[in-house]
Amino acid sequence: MALNLQDKQAIVAEVNEAAKGALSAVIADSRGVTVEKMTELRKSAREAGVTMRVVRNTLLRRAVEGTDYECLKDTFVGPTLIAFSNEHPGAAARLFKEFAKANDKFEIKGAAFEGKIQDVEFLATLPTYEEAIARLMGTMKEAAAGKLARTLAALRDKLQEAA
């Protein structure tokens, strides 16, 4: 279906707005993946706070100009599916990585975070905010418990020497 100029401008504006508000972006090629599987992926993306869109490469190049995702221009070859993470930087990467494991024909082309091309594995393994807080609290709790144990041991040793 041919797009007129207004449609193209609307697509560019929509993708540009999504890019400006996104924390990270992931590019993939979904050739050969069934419609049912893609529908499942889109549903999972909505639940994870990920904006997905299939866009023509020329329109996508224009849409990412002036954004942090301009570095991805070289990956805009062939059918391009772009996903922007809105709530967590690793959400789209994690979603695409899991989907690629189950679907051999789904190929992840690249990812960007804070204006730089990143490894998808790196983005997918980023902890969520809640996970990061839990790790920090665990570390703090361990340190406090260890310090208390050493203090009590030193006090016990001091009392034994005095006795």
Curated annotation (Swiss-Prot):
Protein name: Large ribosomal subunit protein uL10
GO biological process assignments: translation
Recorded superkingdom: Bacteria
SUPFAM superfamilies per UniProt: Ribosomal protein L10-like
A GO molecular function held by the record: large ribosomal subunit rRNA binding
PANTHER family, alphabetized: 39S RIBOSOMAL PROTEIN L10, MITOCHONDRIAL (PTHR11560)
Family indicated by similarity: Belongs to the universal ribosomal protein uL10 family.
Species the sequence originates in: Haemophilus influenzae (strain PittGG)
Gene name of the encoded protein: rplJ
